[in-house]
């Protein structure tokens, strides 16, 4: 007898979660007869959607990017942030051929080094610790002119918090004795991913 299976749909309810608390819990308080019927009639379970379970650093809230990636892969996919964190801890980061080539070129030709990227601890698309590691590399190579261009994170950090992150970068530069903040721009312009040249041009 042929085992006939119907179509299978993976339906993702972004922002949907489980909590035993009812006060302020829109999911628990809402009237969802179809959803309730699914839970009553079919097997179900809870899954973790944050931290190491989705390839993020421990204690870091999940997001749709990593959640969808892990569901699609059927396994935990370590994020780029975690991979770089791992390489910094093991020292592999400091052996990176491309980074070392850039530093060597700056030293050889007495050129300035420009470090640019998202200045944020949102841990979705960046970590400030990565920029700090680059500054340490520049310090060890004896680079004197190092300029940091901060891309502000208006998505994964609290509103009006930019001054805190820029101050942290300045403090780290002062602590290491290398680098200075040369420019500040929002990610809306500097990290546009929709190929809107008018934004990138302004950055």
PLM regions: where:
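Active-site nucleophile/metal-coordination loop of metallo-enzymes that catalyze phosphate/sulfate
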Residues: 2-9, 16-189, 198, 202
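Short, contiguous, pocket-lining structural segments
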Residues: 195
